[in-house]
Amino acid sequence: MDTLKLHSHFENLLYVGRSVLTNTSSRIQRLFFKKEMCIYEYLFKEEASKGIEIVVDNAVLVCVFENDICNKSILYLNDSTNVTSYINYCNSTFEYDKLRDRWIMPDGYLTLFIPNDDFEKRFAFVQTLV
């Protein structure tokens, strides 16, 4: 895939990640009803959290909720081959905040995340609102 197509594809993934923010879990389920998804609830002592994982192209979109409102979206890339191109796209499109280690988007933030406990070392891009 050439650079222009890669950037366009990544831009679309970011758009999908942004589209879930501020939505309820039921609204997100309706928006992505034709996609493969996993809905889960994590319970431990007094702590409870809910999440939705949705397969989108070559990525998995994870929606993180607080009071049933998605406040964070995480795009796990299934293939890290093009991550350099995606980082270059972010560097050329968004201002980078070195102090907080994140890109500043028009209405939020974007962070590159590599989980320490993921044996596959899948890269993820995390979006949050301002």
Per-region residue spans from a language model:
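Broad, structure-driven detector of short, well-ordered beta-strand segments within folded domains
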Residues: 60-66, 102-106, 110-117
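Short helix/turn-capping signatures at newly exposed starts of structured segments
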Residues: 1-101, 129-130
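Glycine-rich, aromatic-bearing surface loops/beta-hairpins
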Residues: 110-130
